Swiss-Prot record:
This is Xylose isomerase. Mg(2+) 2 binds at E267, H270, D306, D308. It is found in: Cytoplasm. The active site is at H100, D103. One of its GO terms (biological process) is D-xylose metabolic process. Homotetramer. It comes from Rhizobium etli (strain ATCC 51251 / DSM 11541 / JCM 21823 / NBRC 15573 / CFN 42). It holds the Pfam family AP_endonuc_2.
Length: 436
């Protein structure tokens, strides 16, 4: 039954590239076969509950601009928000959604009341999922908004805050499992520091390691089959965040023996904040064996902060999905639109239009990436560039069968005098442009 929030808007349909209807897909066709699999199953789109339904439209210089009928901290309002959310998922045809606990339940006066409220809304969500067919991609706990977390959650100097955060994560993993969630995400927005003057780095990193081990231990204890994901971000809200980027997270996981237990949820905007391209973080995660999922939202390249805008750059999406596909595609992860409307976009239809544009952009990127893979447009030049390493002698060199002395003798006796070869960057950039 319609809530009336979206007026008379009907389910969004595919109308093709020539359509000028803003409430129609031009490129996203869920059932189109790409590399032998349905487009929907490749992309695994999810809607972010927080930015889509809880963000009030504020910024550092002004308050709320969105007037939503569910903007009250009551269970009645939470259920109305859920009604609108699941209507939205159905209109959009989004197969998945994601949430923080604080997005979906009213704030209680203590941990017990928070848990009671969460359990009640989870039961309501379960009914909604059964009625609509929408599934949970991942759940997570908000361990950064409440003032108790102003000095961190896992890394807080107060052990009571650590304990409260750990207990909250336990309830959120339970909720995720009950709803059939395929992943559980940890984002350490306050796990970092503002100044080293009051920060014991070693202690805080050790606390974070203990916290993550607790999560993994609990996952196995209850038989949760989903993937535990860490979402890297270099800063904001803290000056320096401990899960800075993919490389930093991998080093942390390796130190704590968790590199085979935890993977990464990579956000495009966070990669940019860390001084990387999105495809760099994706390629590195593949190389390290920790790729899990993505948050698909871009930043304004001039503002210098996390603006969480919908993707609209097809060449960027093509390279991103190239690395996703080259790594074998999503297993339990997917494409979560951690994107929010601009604060002047007040109409309910704007929520749909933003997601439609993002989904079309991703669909175009996916198809371009798939064609590049089919044609070996990038993989063949890459294989040719490193072909020298396939020789018998080079393989022995790589496997460590020669000592440094033996290598030096070999170079001298063979009069090895290598000459550089072109990297063909311009050619490869032109090749990519042919596909997008």
């Amino acid at each position: 039954m319609s809530t009336g929030f979206f007026g008379d808007i009907q389910k969004i349909k595919y109308e093709g590239p020539d359509s000028t209807n803003p409430l129609a897909f031009r490129y996203y066709q869920p059932d189109e076969i790409v590399l032998g699999k349905r487009m929907e199953d490749h992309l695994r789109f999810a809607v972010a509950y927080w930015h889509t339904f809880t963000w009030p439209g504020g910024d550092p210089f002004g308050g709320q601009t969105f007037l939503r009928p569910w903007f009250e901290d009551t269970m009645k309002a939470a259920k109305l928000k859920a009604d609108v959310a699941f209507e939205f998922f159905s209109l959009l045809g989004a197969p998945y959604y994601c949430f923080h606990d604080a997005d979906v339940r009213p704030e209680g006066k203590n941990f017990a009341e928070n848990t009671k409220n969460l359990n009640e809304i989870v039961d309501y969500f379960a009914e909604k999922q059964a009625a609509t067919g929408t599934k949970l991609l991942w759940g997570t706990a908000n361990l950064f908004s409440n003032r108790r977390y102003m000095s961190g959650a896992a890394t807080n100097p107060d052990p009571d805050v650590f304990a409260f955060a750990a207990a909250t994560v336990k309830t959120c993993i339970d909720a995720t499992q009950k709803l059939g969630g395929e992943n559980y995400v940890l984002w350490g927005g306050r796990e970092g520091y503002e100044t080293l003057l009051n920060t014991d780095l070693k202690r805080e990193l050790d606390q974070l390691g203990r916290f993550l081990n607790l999560v993994v231990e609990y996952k196995h204890k209850i038989g949760f089959k989903g993937t535990i994901l860490i979402e890297p971000k270099p800063q904001e809200p803290t000056k320096h965040q401990y899960d800075y980027d993919v490389a930093t997270v991998y080093g942390f996981l390796k130190k704590h023996g968790l590199e085979n237990e935890v993977k990464v949820n990579i956000e495009q905007g966070h990669a940019i904040l860390a001084g990387h391209s999105f495809e760099h973080e994706l390629a590195l995660a593949n190389a390290l064996g920790i790729f899990g999922s993505i948050d698909m939202n871009r930043n304004d390249y001039q503002s210098g902060w996390d603006t969480d805008q919908f993707p609209n750059n097809v060449p960027e999406m093509a390279l991103a999905y190239y690395h996703v596909l080259a790594g074998g595609g999503f297993k339990t992860g997917g494409t979560n639109f951690d994107s929010k409307l601009r604060r002047q976009s007040l109409d309910p239809a704007d929520l749909l239009i933003g997601h439609i544009g993002g989904m079309d952009c991703c669909a175009r990127g996916l198809k371009a990436a798939a064609k590049m893979i089919e044609d070996k447009a990038l993989s063949q030049p890459l294989a040719d560039r490193y072909a020298g390493w396939e020789s018998v002698e080079a393989q022995k060199l790589f496997r460590g069968e020669y000592s440094l002395d033996e290598i030096a003798n070999w170079v001298e006796s063979k009069d090895v005098n290598p000459q550089p070869k072109s990297g063909k960057q311009e050619l490869l950039e032109n090749v990519v442009n042919r596909y997008v």
